[in-house]
Design a protein with these regions (language model features):
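DNA major-groove recognition helix of helix-turn-helix/homeodomain DNA-binding modules
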Residues: 50-68
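Generic recognition of short, well-ordered alpha-helical segments
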Residues: 7, 49-50
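A short, Lys/Arg-rich alpha-helix, primarily the initiator
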Residues: 1-18, 56
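Helix-turn-helix/homeodomain-like alpha-helical modules used for DNA recognition
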Residues: 72-74
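Short alpha-helical DNA-recognition segment
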Residues: 20-38
Length: 74
């Protein structure tokens, strides 16, 4: 897994900004609820390992399509 849980809030917001997605849009793309994405961004919950894998697979697809560039520190 290449997403570090402690960098997650920064990471998930950066993904949404670059892809011009709302929390609801991102939730739909990765198969979770809006409330889940909202809780992640507000530091109420960290994603499960399964959710992290879903996010990584989605981000990998977007990177391959040239739609997403991530900072090296992630």
């Amino acid at each position: 897994m290449w997403i570090k849980r402690y960098d997650f809030v920064f990471f998930i917001k950066e993904v949404r900004v670059q892809l011009d997605l709302s929390q609801e849009d991102l939730a739909r793309e990765i198969g979770v609820s809006f409330a889940t994405v909202n809780r992640w961004e507000n530091r109420r919950f960290l994603p499960s390992k399964m959710a992290l894998r879903q996010i990584e697979m989605y981000c990998d697809r977007m990177i391959k399509l040239g739609r997403l560039l991530l900072p090296d520190k992630l």
